């Protein structure tokens, strides 16, 4: 039982399911930046190093937000607010993972890759968690930069540079992030209110939030389709798939305006995750064929 609790607690601290989406956004850059398929070792070490840095970010986030987490039903049983893991323990593990990540990426990949991953951590912990999230409804718009670094890491790992295609994928995720998290904030509105987080549904109301979700969904869809014209290796497979899933996401966002209920927001939230996975997988498949 003790070992089961240990693994469950650290699973909550490290958030591997969330990190898997970050890792998925690295893979297109690894393939697009290389004339030949990257080596298995380079792929593995880049993903492993990024996993460590992402996990460290989530640990520091939970250390900082422990008091607010205790006020939210969804987070009150997390290891730190419930007392199963101490702040000191979590901080030391976070520092160790952060340092290990930087070393692994700098030594076995290159310094630019390590700096990109570290910049994501700094952005998430300081810009988003400490400064923006408790202060503004636009917290996720600006603070979402941290979750967009995957493509930069992928391109940097192969070419030791950040070409325009890397930044276009960065911008794609940047535009995806607000709609995704505002949908989450709709069906967790009361909990965010209890924890005093000024999320958009709490401050501006659900109707305004659904209109903002629709607006960012359109911008994100334009960015997805535009990548076909920016990346010469993209073929009709990517164009067709991106058009189909973007149209469907647009329909869901419009339905959310018409029916702004938590269940509709939840449906949009989970589809947005699937959408980003599909886009990234299609980029790689189209490039390889």
Curated annotation (Swiss-Prot):
GO terms for biological process: heme biosynthetic process; heme O biosynthetic process. It is found in: Cell inner membrane. InterPro entries: Protohaem_IX_farnesylTrfase (IPR006369), UbiA_prenyltransferase (IPR000537), UbiA_sf (IPR044878). Keywords: Cell inner membrane, Cell membrane, Heme biosynthesis, Membrane, Transferase, Transmembrane, Transmembrane helix. Pathway: Porphyrin-containing compound metabolism; heme O biosynthesis; heme O from protoheme: step 1/1. One of its GO terms (cellular component) is plasma membrane. It catalyses: heme b + (2E,6E)-farnesyl diphosphate + H2O = Fe(II)-heme o + diphosphate. Its main location: membrane. It is an enzyme of class 2 (transferase). Its EC number is 2.5.1.141. The keyword NADP does not apply. One of its GO terms (molecular function) is protoheme IX farnesyltransferase activity. It is a multi-pass membrane protein. Pfam families: UbiA. The keyword RNA-binding does not apply. The chain crosses the membrane at residues 18-38, 40-60, 87-107, 111-131, 139-159, 168-188, 212-232, 234-254, 269-289. It comes from the Bacteria. Belongs to the UbiA prenyltransferase family. Protoheme IX farnesyltransferase subfamily. Carbon 2 of the heme B porphyrin ring is defined according to the Fischer nomenclature. Converts heme B (protoheme IX) to heme O by substitution of the vinyl group on carbon 2 of heme B porphyrin ring with a hydroxyethyl farnesyl side group. This is Protoheme IX farnesyltransferase. It comes from Leptospira interrogans serogroup Icterohaemorrhagiae serovar Lai (strain 56601). The lineage of its organism: Bacteria, Pseudomonadati, Spirochaetota, Spirochaetia, Leptospirales. The gene is ctaB.
């Amino acid at each position: 039982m003790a070992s089961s609790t240990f693994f469950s607690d650290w699973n909550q601290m490290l958030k591997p399911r969330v990190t898997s989406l970050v890792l998925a956004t690295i893979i297109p850059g690894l393939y697009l930046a290389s004339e030949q398929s990257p080596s298995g070792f380079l792929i593995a070490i880049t993903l492993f190093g990024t996993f460590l840095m992402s996990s460290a970010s989530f640990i520091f986030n939970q250390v900082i937000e422990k008091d607010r987490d205790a006020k939210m039903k969804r987070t009150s049983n997390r290891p730190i607010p419930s007392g199963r893991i101490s702040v000191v323990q979590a901080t030391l593990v976070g520092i160790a993972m952060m340092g290990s990540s930087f070393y692994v990426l700098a030594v076995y990949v290159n310094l630019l890759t390590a700096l990109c991953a570290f910049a994501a951590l700094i952005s998430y912990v300081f810009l988003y968690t400490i400064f923006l999230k408790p202060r503004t409804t636009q917290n996720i718009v600006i603070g979402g930069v941290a979750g967009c670094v995957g493509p930069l890491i992928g391109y940097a790992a192969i070419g030791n540079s950040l070409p325009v295609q890397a930044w276009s994928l960065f911008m794609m995720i940047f535009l995806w992030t607000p709609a995704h998290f505002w949908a989450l904030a709709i069906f967790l509105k009361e909990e965010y209110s209890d924890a005093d987080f000024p999320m958009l549904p709490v401050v501006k109301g659900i109707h305004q939030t659904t209109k903002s979700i629709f607006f960012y969904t359109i911008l994100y869809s334009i960015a997805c389709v535009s990548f076909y014209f920016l990346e010469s290796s993209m073929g009709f497979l990517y164009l067709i798939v991106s058009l189909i899933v973007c149209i469907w996401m647009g329909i869901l966002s419009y339905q959310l305006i018409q029916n702004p209920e938590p269940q509709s927001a939840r449906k949009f939230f989970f589809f947005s995750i699937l959408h980003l996975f599909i886009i990234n997988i299609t980029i790689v498949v189209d490039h390889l064929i």
